[in-house]
C-alpha cells in the first residue's frame, strides 16, 4: 500500500501539477486567481471562501504533495504511516478543500450525488482525499452515495481505486494497457460497496485514515454544505437526474412565442428543440454555463410553452459560476493569463507530466477534457477519464461512475496524461468531475474548464471531449460540453495553455520527418507509427474499448465513439488550434508523441478550423479498420470550423481516416435533425480514395459498415499538413441524428484517401440517421453519402433536401454558412471530398447514381474549402438522379477540382436531363496539385484550412513526377491539359482526361456543361459537351444576375450569377447562392466568360499574354484573363506550353500545373487560417527543366503594399498563377496586370507556416514587375513568401519558409534552391536566391545602405520616396532601434529633415514604386498624382540617376553589375554567400533594369522584382548591416540597392561567405567580399 500510496502520491503530484496548470489557468480565468493559485496546487476549483480558509491546509497539503512528488520522483515506497499522515493532512486539507470543492464542485453536482448536499460534500471530501492521495491519480471519482457510510466506503473504494489507478496509471505510464482501469469505472454504488471491501483489503492504513478523514470530512462537509449549500449542486444533480426545480438555467434565456419555446444559450445560440439542445450540449465550443451538472436536458429544457419560465435555483452553482467567468468569457483571459500560471504550473506539471506523459501521451484526454462549470477542471479530468473509460468500454451507467470512468480512462495513456493534468483539478473538484461528467455544463463549469481544461485541452482539443459527455453515464443526458469548451475560437488559447505542456513534451518529438521534407522518411515513420499504434495503441485502446480504442490524439481527437468522435472533432479543433499554435505533435496512440510535420502547425488555430485530422496511424486499428468511421460532429461553434485547420492542423498526414467507432456514439451530432433515410442513403460518406496516398490509410479508412452513426470522416492520411476533413461544423448539428454512413470496410479502405467530412450541416443532413446502404461496400456510395454529408456540413446553412424522387439536394445556404466555398471564411465548412474509387457509381436511393470521383481533386480540394455537394438522386431537375456517370462525373469533378481553388460547388451530373449537382469543389480539388492548398484567403483567417489531400501531397510529389509523365492514357487533351488534373488521371484515365481543366471542357461533351462559379467571378464556366446542344436554351446572365436574354449562345459564354444555372430547357435554375460553387450542368454549351464569350483562338498559346484559356466543350477558348477579369484576379500566367493549365475560376484557386517536371517534392503551402493565400507550387516541376520554368504561383490575396486586410474574399483570395513560362515567355504585363488584380501578397502568417512554399515568381498581375509579395502585415512572411520570379521562374520556386521560424521548410528550400540557383547564376537571372538566405536563417528586416533610395510611409501616404541618410549629428540611435534607419523624404521642399523609420516599414525603390503604382491604381480617384508626391518621385529618380551614374559608371543593363560591397559593421552572420550571391544577382538584375523595377520590363524587371521581393535576397549595407544582423526575420528584398559607396571596394573579390551552400555557387558569380561573420560585408547592389 505504501508503494501504492507512493505511486498515488506521485501520480497525484503529476495530476495536481497538470491540474494546477489547468487550474491556474482556470483560476486566472475565474478571477479567483489568488485562491485558486494556492488551491490550484491542491484543487483547481477552490472557488469558495473555504478555499481561502483552506489555504494553510492546502499549503500543507501542497507541501505533502511536494513530499509525495519527491517520493514519486524517487519512487520511494512510503510507509503506510507516512501515507496515513499524508492522508490525514489530505484529510484536513481535503475537508477544507472539499468544502471548497463542495462549493465549487457541488455546483457541478456529483453525478451520483443523490444524497444530501452533505453527502455530496463528503463525497467531495472523499474524492478530494482520494484525489489528494492520488493527486488526481484517481480519475474515477466515486460519487458518494447518499449514505455517509457509503461515502466512507467510497473513500475506501476511492483509496483502493486510487491505488488501483495508481498502479494502472503506472502501467499506463509504462504504456501497459490498463484494462483494470476500466473496471474502476464501475458504477459509483458498486464502487462504493466494492471499495468498502477492497479498500480495507487494499490498504488498510490508508483506508482507515481515509475513513477517519472521511468522517471528519463528512462532518465538516455537512457543516460546510449546510452553511454553503455546497450540496446544491449535488442536490441539483439529484434533481436533474429526476427533475429540475426550474426550466431556465442561469445565463440562459427562455423565450416563448406562438406556443413555441426557444432557449437562448449564454453565447446567443437559439435552440428550439430537444435535439438542438442536445446537439448543442454535445457540441464542443458551445457555452453551457449555468446548466446543472448532472444535466438531463429533457427535464431542464422544457419546450412546453404552457410552462412559465422558472429560473433554476442553483445557489452553489451560481456562486461557483459567478466567481469564475465563463469559459467563453475566459478564453481571452486564459489565453493570456492562463499561460502564466499554466506555464509555472506546467513547469512543475511538466516534470511530473513528462513522466506520466510518456504513459499518458496516447490517452485521448481530449475526449474528457471539456467540462463545464466550476467542476470544469475535475470535470475535464473526469471527462477525459470518462471518455477514456467510455473508450475503455468501461462506461459506468451512472453519472457518478463517470469519475470511475475517468479512472478507467487512465487505461489510455493519454487519459493518464490528461488525467494527470485533470487529476490535479480533480483533486480539487472530485465531485465536480462527476458532476462535470454529467453532460450538463453548469455555467460555472465552463469557467473551470478554462482552468482545468488548458492542459487537457492541450491534450484534447480545447479539452472538450464532446463525446465524453455523451459518453458520460450521466443519466444518459449526454451533454457534450466540449461544445462549451470548443465554443469560441478562444478555445485555442486554452488549448495553448494546455498545449504548452503537451507541446513542450510533444515538440521535442517534432523532429519526425516532415512529409514535405522527407516524404519517404515521413511515410516510413507514419507506417511505423501506424504499426506501432496498431500493436501498442490497439492494446491500450482495445483495453479501453474495442472500438473506442482509437484514442483521440491531442491532434487527432478521434474519439472512440461517435460521441467521442464529436469530441474528437471538437478536440481536433482544439487540438488543431493548439497544434496550430504550438505545433503540438499529435500523440501517437502509443505513448509517444508523434511530431506532426511542421505543416501541421499550419492548421488554423481557429477553433473554427476543425481539422479532422486523424492520424490514421494513430488510430489505425489493424483489426478494426472499420471502426475508422469517425463521426465528425461539427461543433456548434459560432465560427464554422474547418478541420483545416488544417486545415489547420498540418499534422503529418493522417494515415488513417479518422477512426472512431461510431457504434459507441448513440447519435451522430452530424446528422441534422431531419435526416431522411434517402438523405442518409445519399449522404455519401466520403471514403478516402486509395489513390497514391499513404498505403496505411486504408487500414484506418476502413469503416465498419455497422458504424452507421459515424460518417467516416477520413482525412486522407496523406495530407499531413492539411486537415483533410474540413468540417463545417454547424452549431445546428442535430445531436440525435446519426448519419451512419457505413461503407463497406473494404470500400472504406479503398477510400482511405478521400477525406470524408461528415460534417453535419446544422440542418443539412436530414435528422433521421442516415443509414447508408453503403454496407454494400460501394465505396463510392459512401462517398456520395460523405458528399451529402459534406454538403450538409458544408452548407452549414446548407440544406440537404431529399426530393421525393429520392434525390439529395444539398443546397448550401450562402447566408447561413455561406456556401462553404463561398464563404472561405467558413473554411472547411463542407469538405466533402468524394474521393472514391474512380468511376464507381453508387446507386442512390432515387436510383440515381452518384459517381464517386476517384479523382482526389474534388475530395482533396473540397477539404480546404467547404464544398457543397449536391447529389442528384434521380429525378429532380436540380439534381439529376444520376449524379454523374462515373468517369464523366469524375471528369467534371476533376475539372472543378482544377478550378477547385475557390471553394466551388461542382454540379456533377452527366445527367441527360440536365440535373445539376452542385458540388462545392474543394479548392485543392485537383489532386494533381497536391500542393494546392486551398487556403481560403477569406477573412476567417483561423478558419482557413490548408487542405491538401494526402494524396495531393504525395501526389504532388509522385504525381508531379509521375502524373505529368503519365497524362491520362487516352486523352491527348488530358495530356495537353495541365497535369493538375492528370494526377487524378491515374485513377481513372478517361475520366481524368476529362477532368483536366481544358480536357474537362473538351470532355465536356460527355458531361454536360460545367459551370464554374467562383464567388468572386460569379460566373459559370460551362463546358458544353456539344455547343450545339440546346443553344436556344442558353440565357445570358449578367453578373448582376439579370438575364440579358435567352440567347442561343452555343459558343457564347453565359455569365451567370453565382447561383444561377441554366437548365437544359433554358430555364434558369438558381441554386442558392453558391458563390464558390461550380455548377456543372450536363447540357448547355455555355461557357462563362466575363465579357466576351470567346477568344477565337482554338489553340491555347502559352505565350499569349501568359493567359490561360478555358476551353469550352464547343472548342471555344476564352482567355482566362477575360474570363476572370474581375479583381478576383485569377492569376494564370501562360499555360504551360506542355499542357494548357486549367485556370480555376475561383479566385483562391491555385492552379499549379504539374508540368512534366516531376519534382518529387510537392511544395505545399500551408497557410495559416488567417492567410487566405496559399501558394501551391510544384516546386519540383520547376526543378524539372529550365525550358519550362517552374510554375509560378502568385499569391496575391492583397496588394502587398496595402495592409493585409481582406478587401473582399474574392480579391483577397490568393491568386496562384501557375505558369511554366519560359523565362520571360509570359509578358509580365499581360500576365501580371491582367492576372493579378491585387498585388501578390502572401500573408506573413502563411509564410510562417513552414509549409508555405512560394513557388517561384509571384505575378503581380497588374504590373509586369512582380509585386513584391511582401505581406504587409507580416514581416517574416514577406521573405518567406517572396517568390523570385526572376527570368527563370523555376528558380523562383523557393520554398521560402515564409517565416524564418519555419526553418525546416526553409532548409528544404535551401537544398532545393541551390540546384536551381546553380543553374540560375548561369542564367544570369541571378534571381536573388532569396530562398537560400530565407531558408538559412530568419532574415532580419531588410537593410538599407546609406544613400539608398527607398519608399516608406510618409506624409500620409503609404508610399513616399525617400533616401537613407546617415544618423544626424548629435543624435544617438538607441541600440534597440537597430531596425530603424534615418530616412530623408524627397519632396521636402529643401527641408532636409530626416526621420527615424523602422526598416520594416520601408520598401526598396522598386517595391515602393510598385506599391505606389498599385496604390494609385487602387485608390486614385483622379488621374492626377499628388504634386508633392510627383515631385518627390522625380527627385528620387534624379537622385537615383545620380547615384547610379556615380557609383556604377558602367551600369549597363547587362548582367555585369558592379557590386559595391559595403562592410556591414555588424552584418549578421546569416548573410551568407547565398545572400550575397543573391544580392549580386539582384544587383545585376537591378543594373540590368536599374529603374526597371518601375518599368514593366518583362523578364528582368519581374525577375528582379521577384528576386528582390523575395525576402531572402537582402543587400546589407553598412548602415543597415547592424539592422540586418539583428533582424533577418523580416527581410524585404531590396530589389534596388542604391549604394553611394563606390563599387570598387570589393568588386571582383568574389570572396563570399558561403553560409548557404546553395548560395556558394551563385556567390561565386557575385563579386564582393562578404564575411558571414557578425560583421559581414554585404554586397550592395550598386545600381
UniProtKB/Swiss-Prot annotation:
Cited InterPro entries: DNA-bd_dom_sf, Methyl_CpG_DNA-bd, PWWP_dom
Domain PWWP: 1346-1408
Presence of keyword Glycoprotein: no
Keywords of this entry: Coiled coil, Developmental protein
Coiled coil regions, renumbered to chain: 1415-1446
CDD domains cross-referenced by the UniProt entry: PWWP_MBD5
Composition-biased stretches (Pro residues): 440-449
GO molecular function annotations of the record: chromatin binding; DNA binding
Gene3D superfamilies: 2.30.30.140
Pfam families in UniProt: PWWP
Disulfide bond residue pairs: none
Region (Disordered): 81-115, 427-457, 556-579, 630-694, 839-862, 940-980, 1179-1247, 1287-1339, 1471-1497
Limits of the MBD domain: 238-308
Keyword Cell division carried by entry: no
GO cellular component, one term: nucleus
Biased composition (Low complexity): 83-104, 430-439, 563-579, 679-693, 851-862, 1323-1333, 1474-1488
Compositionally skewed regions (Polar residues) per UniProt: 658-677, 1179-1195, 1216-1240, 1287-1313
Function (record text): Non-catalytic component of the polycomb repressive deubiquitinase (PR-DUB) complex, a complex that specifically mediates deubiquitination of histone H2A monoubiquitinated at 'Lys-119' (H2AK118ub1). Important for maintaining stability of the PR-DUB complex. Probable epigenetic regulator involved in developmental pattern formation and eye development.
Note: Named 'six-banded' due to its distinctive embryonic expression pattern.
Subunit structure and binding partners: Component of the polycomb repressive deubiquitinase (PR-DUB) complex, at least composed of caly/calypso, Asx and sba (MDB5/6 homolog). Interacts (via MBD domain) with Asx (via PHD domain); the interaction is important for the stability of the PR-DUB complex.
Name by which UniProt lists this protein: Methyl-CpG-binding domain protein 5/6 homolog sba
Amino acid at each position: 500500500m505504501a508503494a501504492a500510496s507512493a505511486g498515488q502520491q506521485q501520480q497525484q503530484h503529476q495530476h495536481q501539477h497538470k491540474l494546477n496548470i489547468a487550474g491556474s489557468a482556470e483560476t486566472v480565468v475565474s478571477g479567483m486567481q489568488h485562491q485558486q493559485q494556492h488551491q490550484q496546487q491542491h484543487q483547481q476549483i477552490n472557488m469558495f471562501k473555504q478555499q481561502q480558509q483552506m489555504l494553510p491546509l492546502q499549503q500543507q497539503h501542497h507541501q505533502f504533495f511536494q513530499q509525495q512528488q519527491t517520493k514519486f520522483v524517487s519512487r520511494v515506497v512510503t510507509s503506510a504511516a507516512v501515507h496515513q499522515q499524508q492522508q490525514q493532512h489530505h484529510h484536513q486539507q481535503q475537508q477544507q478543500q472539499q468544502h471548497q470543492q463542495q462549493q465549487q464542485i457541488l455546483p457541478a453536482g456529483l453525478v451520483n450525488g443523490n444524497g444530501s448536499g452533505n453527502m455530496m460534500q463528503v463525497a467531495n471530501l472523499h474524492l478530494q482525499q482520494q484525489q489528494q492521495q492520488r493527486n488526481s491519480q484517481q480519475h474515477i471519482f466515486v460519487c458518494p452515495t447518499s449514505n455517509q457510510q457509503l461515502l466512507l466506503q467510497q473513500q475506501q473504494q476511492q483509496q483502493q481505486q486510487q491505488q488501483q489507478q495508481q498502479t494502472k496509471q503506472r502501467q499506463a505510464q509504462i504504456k501497459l494497457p490498463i484494462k483494470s482501469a476500466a473496471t474502476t469505472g464501475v458504477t459509483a454504488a458498486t464502487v462504493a460497496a466494492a471499495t468498502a471491501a477492497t479498500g480495507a483489503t487494499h490498504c488498510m492504513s490508508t483506508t482507515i485514515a481515509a475513513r477517519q478523514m472521511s468522517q471528519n470530512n463528512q462532518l465538516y462537509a455537512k457543516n460546510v454544505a449546510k452553511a454553503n449549500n455546497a450540496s446544491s449542486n449535488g442536490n441539483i444533480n439529484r434533481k436533474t437526474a429526476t427533475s429540475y426545480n426550474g426550466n431556465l438555467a442561469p445565463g440562459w434565456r427562455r423565450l416563448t412565442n406562438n406556443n413555441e419555446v426557444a432557449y437562448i444559450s449564454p453565447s446567443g445560440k437559439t435552440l428550439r428543440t430537444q435535439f438542438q439542445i442536445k446537439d448543442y450540449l454535445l457540441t464542443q465550443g458551445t457555452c453551457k454555463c449555468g446548466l446543472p451538472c448532472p444535466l438531463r436536458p429533457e427535464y431542464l429544457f422544457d419546450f412546453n410553452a404552457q410552462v412559465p419560465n422558472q429560473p433554476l435555483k442553483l445557489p452553489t452553482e451560481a456562486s461557483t459560476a459567478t466567481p469564475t467567468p465563463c469559459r467563453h468569457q475566459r478564453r481571452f483571459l486564459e489565453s493570456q493569463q492562463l499561460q502564466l500560471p499554466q506555464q509555472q504550473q506546467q513547469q512543475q506539471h511538466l516534470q511530473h507530466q513528462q513522466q506520466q506523459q510518456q504513459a499518458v501521451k496516447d490517452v485521448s484526454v481530449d475526449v474528457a477534457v471539456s467540462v463545464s462549470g466550476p467542476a470544469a477542471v475535475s470535470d475535464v479530468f473526469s471527462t477525459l477519464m470518462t471518455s477514456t473509460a467510455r473508450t475503455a468500454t468501461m462506461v459506468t451507467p451512472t453519472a457518478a461512475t463517470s469519475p470511475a470512468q475517468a479512472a478507467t480512462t487512465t487505461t489510455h495513456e493519454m487519459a493518464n496524461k490528461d488525467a494527470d493534468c485533470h487529476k490535479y483539478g480533480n483533486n480539487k473538484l472530485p465531485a465536480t468531475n462527476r458532476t462535470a461528467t454529467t453532460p450538463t455544463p453548469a455555467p460555472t463549469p465552463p469557467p473551470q474548464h478554462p482552468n482545468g481544461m488548458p492542459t487537457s485541452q492541450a491534450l484534447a482539443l480545447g479539452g472538450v471531449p464532446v463525446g465524453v459527455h455523451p459518453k458520460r453515464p450521466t443519466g444518459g443526458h449526454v451533454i457534450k460540453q466540449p461544445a462549451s469548451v470548443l465554443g469560441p475560437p478562444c478555445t485555442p488559447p486554452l488549448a495553448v495553455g494546455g498545449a504548452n505542456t503537451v507541446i513542450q513534451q510533444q515538440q521535442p518529438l517534432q523532429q519526425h520527418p516532415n512529409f514535405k521534407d522527407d516524404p519517404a522518411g515521413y511515410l516510413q515513420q507514419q507506417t511505423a507509427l501506424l504499426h506501432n499504434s496498431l500493436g501498442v495503441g490497439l492494446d491500450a485502446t482495445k483495453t479501453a474499448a474495442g472500438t473506442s480504442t482509437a484514442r483521440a490524439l491531442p491532434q487527432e481527437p478521434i474519439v472512440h465513439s461517435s460521441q467521442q468522435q464529436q469530441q474528437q472533432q471538437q478536440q481536433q479543433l482544439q487540438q488543431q488550434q493548439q497544434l496550430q499554435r504550438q505545433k503540438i505533435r499529435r500523440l501517437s496512440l502509443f505513448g509517444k508523441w508523434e511530431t506532426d510535420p511542421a505543416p501541421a502547425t499550419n492548421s488554423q488555430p481557429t477553433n473554427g478550423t476543425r481539422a479532422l485530422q486523424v492520424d490514421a496511424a494513430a488510430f489505425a486499428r489493424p483489426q478494426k479498420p472499420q471502426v475508422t468511421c469517425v463521426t465528425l460532429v461539427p461543433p456548434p461553434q459560432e465560427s464554422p470550423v474547418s478541420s483545416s485547420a488544417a486545415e489547420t492542423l498540418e499534422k503529418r498526414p493522417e494515415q488513417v481516416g479518422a477512426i472512431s467507432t461510431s457504434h459507441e456514439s448513440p447519435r451522430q451530432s452530424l446528422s441534422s435533425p431531419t435526416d431522411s433515410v434517402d438523405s442518409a442513403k445519399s449522404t455519401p460518406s466520403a471514403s478516402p480514395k486509395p489513390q497514391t496516398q499513404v498505403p496505411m490509410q486504408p487500414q484506418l479508412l476502413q469503416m465498419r459498415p455497422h458504424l452507421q452513426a459515424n460518417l467516416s470522416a477520413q482525412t486522407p492520411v496523406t495530407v499531413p499538413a492539411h486537415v483533410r476533413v474540413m468540417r463545417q461544423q454547424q452549431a445546428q448539428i442535430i445531436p440525435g441524428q446519426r448519419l451512419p454512413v457505413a461503407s463497406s470496410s473494404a470500400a472504406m479502405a479503398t477510400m482511405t484517401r478521400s477525406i470524408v467530412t461528415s460534417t453535419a450541416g446544422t440542418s443539412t443532413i436530414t435528422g433521421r440517421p442516415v443509414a447508408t446502404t453503403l454496407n454494400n461496400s460501394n465505396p463510392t456510395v459512401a462517398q456520395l453519402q460523405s458528399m451529402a454529408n459534406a454538403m450538409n456540413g458544408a452548407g452549414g446553412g446548407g440544406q440537404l433536401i431529399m426530393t421525393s424522387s429520392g434525390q439529395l439536394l444539398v443546397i448550401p445556404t450562402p447566408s447561413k454558412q455561406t456556401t462553404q466555398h463561398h464563404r472561405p471564411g467558413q473554411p472547411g465548412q463542407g469538405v466533402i471530398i468524394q474521393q472514391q474509387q474512380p468511376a464507381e457509381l453508387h446507386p442512390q436511393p432515387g436510383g440515381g447514381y452518384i459517381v464517386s470521383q476517384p479523382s482526389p481533386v474534388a475530395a482533396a480540394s473540397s477539404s480546404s474549402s467547404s464544398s457543397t455537394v449536391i447529389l442528384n438522386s434521380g429525378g429532380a431537375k436540380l439534381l439529376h438522379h444520376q449524379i454523374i456517370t462515373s468517369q464523366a462525373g469524375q471528369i467534371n469533378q476533376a475539372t472543378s477540382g482544377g478550378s477547385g481553388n475557390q471553394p466551388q460547388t461542382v454540379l456533377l451530373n452527366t445527367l441527360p436531363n440536365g440535373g445539376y449537382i452542385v458540388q462545392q469543389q474543394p479548392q485543392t480539388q485537383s489532386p494533381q496539385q497536391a500542393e494546392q492548398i486551398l487556403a481560403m484567403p477569406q477573412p476567417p483567417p483561423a478558419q482557413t484550412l490548408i487542405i491538401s489531400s494526402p494524396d495531393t501531397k504525395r501526389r504532388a510529389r509522385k504525381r508531379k513526377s509521375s502524373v505529368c509523365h503519365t497524362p491520362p492514357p487516352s486523352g491527348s487533351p488530358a495530356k495537353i491539359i495541365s497535369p493538375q488534373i492528370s494526377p487524378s488521371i491515374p485513377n481513372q484515365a478517361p475520366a481524368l482526361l476529362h477532368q483536366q481543366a481544358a480536357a474537362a471542357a473538351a470532355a465536356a461533351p460527355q458531361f454536360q456543361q460545367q459551370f464554374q462559379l467562383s464567388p468572386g467571378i460569379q460566373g459559370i464556366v460551362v463546358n458544353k459537351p456539344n455547343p450545339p446542344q440546346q443553344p436556344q436554351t442558353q440565357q445570358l446572365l449578367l453578373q448582376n444576375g439579370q438575364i440579358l436574354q435567352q440567347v442561343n449562345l452555343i459558343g457564347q459564354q453565359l455569365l451567370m450569377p453565382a447561383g444561377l444555372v441554366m437548365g437544359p430547357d433554358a430555364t434558369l435554375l438558381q441554386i442558392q447562392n453558391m458563390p464558390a460553387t461550380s455548377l456543372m450542368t450536363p447540357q448547355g454549351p455555355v461557357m462563362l466568360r466575363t465579357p466576351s464569350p470567346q477568344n477565337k483562338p482554338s489553340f491555347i498559346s502559352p505565350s499569349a499574354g501568359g493567359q490561360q484559356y478555358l476551353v469550352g466543350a464547343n472548342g471555344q477558348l476564352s482567355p482566362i484573363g477575360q474570363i476572370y477579369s474581375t479583381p478576383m484576379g485569377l492569376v494564370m500566367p501562360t499555360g504551360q506550353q506542355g499542357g494548357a493549365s486549367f485556370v480555376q475560376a475561383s479566385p483562391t484557386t491555385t492552379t499549379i500545373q504539374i508540368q512534366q517536371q516531376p519534382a518529387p517534392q510537392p511544395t505545399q503551402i500551408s497557410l495559416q487560417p488567417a492567410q487566405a493565400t496559399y501558394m501551391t507550387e510544384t516546386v519540383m516541376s520547376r526543378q524539372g527543366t529550365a525550358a519550362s520554368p517552374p510554375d509560378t504561383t502568385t499569391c496575391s490575396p492583397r496588394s502587398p503594399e496595402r495592409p493585409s486586410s481582406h478587401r473582399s474574399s474574392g480579391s483577397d483570395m490568393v491568386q496562384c498563377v501557375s505558369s511554366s513560362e519560359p523565362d520571360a515567355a509570359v509578358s509580365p504585363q499581360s500576365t501580371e496586370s491582367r492576372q493579378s488584380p491585387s498585388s501578390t501578397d502572401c500573408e506573413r502568417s502563411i509564410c510562417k507556416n513552414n509549409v508555405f512554399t512560394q513557388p517561384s515568381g509571384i505575378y503581380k498581375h497588374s504590373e509586369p514587375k512582380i509585386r513584391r509579395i511582401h505581406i504587409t502585415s507580416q514581416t517574416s512572411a514577406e521573405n518567406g513568401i517572396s517568390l523570385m520570379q526572376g527570368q527563370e521562374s523555376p528558380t523562383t520556386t523557393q520554398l521560402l519558409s515564409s517565416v524564418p521560424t519555419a526553418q525546416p521548410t526553409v532548409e528544404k528550400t535551401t537544398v532545393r534552391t541551390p540546384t536551381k540557383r546553380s543553374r540560375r547564376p548561369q542564367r544570369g537571372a541571378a534571381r536573388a536566391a532569396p530562398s537560400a538566405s530565407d531558408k538559412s536563417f530568419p532574415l532580419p528586416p531588410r537593410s538599407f545602405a546609406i544613400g539608398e533610395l527607398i519608399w516608406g510611409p510618409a506624409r500620409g501616404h503609404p508610399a513616399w520616396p525617400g533616401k537613407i541618410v546617415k544618423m544626424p549629428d548629435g543624435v544617438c540611435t538607441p541600440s534597440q532601434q537597430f531596425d530603424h534607419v534615418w530616412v530623408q523624404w524627397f519632396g521636402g521642399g529643401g527641408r532636409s529633415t530626416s526621420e527615424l523609420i523602422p526598416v520594416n516599414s520601408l520598401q526598396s525603390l522598386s517595391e515602393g514604386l510598385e506599391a505606389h503604382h498599385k496604390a494609385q491604381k487602387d485608390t486614385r480617384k483622379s488621374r492626377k498624382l499628388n504634386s508633392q508626391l510627383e515631385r518627390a518621385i522625380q527627385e528620387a529618380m534624379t537622385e537615383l540617376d545620380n547615384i547610379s551614374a556615380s557609383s556604377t559608371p558602367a551600369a549597363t543593363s547587362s548582367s555585369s553589375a558592379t557590386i559595391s560591397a559595403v562592410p556591414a559593421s555588424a552584418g549578421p552572420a546569416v548573410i551568407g554567400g547565398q545572400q550575397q550571391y543573391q544580392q549580386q544577382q539582384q544587383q545585376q538584375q537591378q543594373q540590368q533594369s536599374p529603374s526597371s523595377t518601375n518599368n514593366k520590363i518583362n523578364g528582368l524587371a519581374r525577375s528582379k522584382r521577384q528576386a528582390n521581393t523575395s525576402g531572402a535576397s537582402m543587400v546589407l549595407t553598412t548602415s543597415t548591416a547592424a539592422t540586418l544582423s539583428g533582424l533577418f526575420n523580416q527581410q524585404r528584398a531590396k530589389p534596388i540597392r542604391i549604394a553611394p559607396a563606390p563599387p570598387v571596394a570589393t568588386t571582383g573579390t568574389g570572396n563570399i561567405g558561403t553560409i548557404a551552400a546553395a548560395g556558394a555557387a551563385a556567390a561565386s558569380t557575385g563579386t564582393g567580399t562578404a564575411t558571414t561573420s557578425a560583421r559581414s560585408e554585404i554586397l550592395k547592389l550598386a545600381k
